[in-house]
Amino acid sequence: MRTEPPVPTKALEAIRAALGPGAESVDAPILQPLGLLLDLAGEAMRARLFVVQAEGGAELCLRPDFTVAVARRHLDGGAASGRYFYEGPAFRAAPGTERPEEFVQMGVEAFAPPSGDGAAADAEIAGLAWRAATAGGRSDLSLWLGDVGLFAAFIESLGLPATLSARLKRVAGRPRLLQAELARAGHVAAPAANQGQLAALLAGRSEGDTAALLEEVWALAGIEPVGGRGPAEIAARLVRRAEAAAAPALGQPEAQAIAAFMAISEPAAAGLARVRGLAGGKAKALTAALAVWDARLTDLARSVPADRMRFAPALGHAFDYYDGLTFEVRSEALGPDRPVAVGGRYDGLLARLGGGPGRAVGCMVRPWRAFAGGEA
């Protein structure tokens, strides 16, 4: 396993000093449940994970990052609010490259009740990531901003059929699936019956009804599921497949608007103006979301120079639990594939981990990339 060179103590201390104040220092188990992480990132992530399994035991993996583990720790503690700082090694396989596979991460995860001011917290954490990244000494950094939730509001502005709108929102963080939707623009949807008997059977059913149907079939057949996905998760996947088969295709004008939205990559203020120009006729939710962005940029301008901020609404990360703001601090020398810092908002992850409603936002810094004499 390839490891990073050590970062000088002075640089580590500077980055730590930018992130740590006001946060409780925590650790996380190096071994994490594989199934949970694949559910959050998709099966394609498996190739990037170091998988371990004792004979007869559950599949585990070396932690690829800290966010999920820290969120689970927060939920286990039962507190409504919490702010946690972590520092330690993370592990991701990088076959066919010379990149380190064991590397140090530092970061902060902040949790609050659902009534908290999300936009202010977003700006605070993104600004924190910027200060921590610049503390390493690089002078070629820029802050890239995106928003998973803004895509949903933009889709609503186009006035699409409900089934198509829902499907597009679900694939927002999966470029391959979204491109497939754009590619079939203008095509007439085939009837569900032509997409297979299962799709025809499930068309129009809720996930709850489908899960109950699966359990009934298993009971009649005497099937006892062992491990793997449960009926609720299988039902969700089957219902989405049925919806995909029955959903109408995009029209060409709407597909072009979505493609233009996904291609935005401009200075922050200009990028928001571009979104406003692409909006459809039902833009109430989008107008509200853009007002939040105006406030967010005002807050960010207190810590990040305006000429260093860029807006790219399609910006995403390897894990698809982000459901609001996303951001990266990038180095011109390292390029977009090796960000110095990443983060964003992931309120929905708390419910997916078994918790109640709440707000969650965090950031992670790679010290070796932030260090001016480090990764090149």
Predicted feature locations:
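Polyanion/phosphate-binding surface patch
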Residues: I30-L60, A93-P95, F103
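Short, N-terminal intrinsically disordered low-complexity segments that are rich in Pro/Gly
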Residues: M1-T9, G56, L60
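Acidic, His- and aromatic-enriched active-site or binding-groove loops in soluble protein domains
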Residues: R46-G56, G159-P191
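Short, solvent-exposed helix-helix connector turns and helix-capping sites enriched
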Residues: D147, G173-R176, P267
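Polyanion-binding and phosphate-handling cores
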Residues: E43, D65, P114-S115, E124-G127, ...
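Positively charged, Gly/Ser-enriched RNA/tRNA-binding surfaces
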Residues: E4-V26, I30-P33, D65-G78, Y84-R138, ...
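Beta-rich nucleic-acid/ligand-interaction surfaces
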Residues: A28-A47, G146-E156, L315-G324
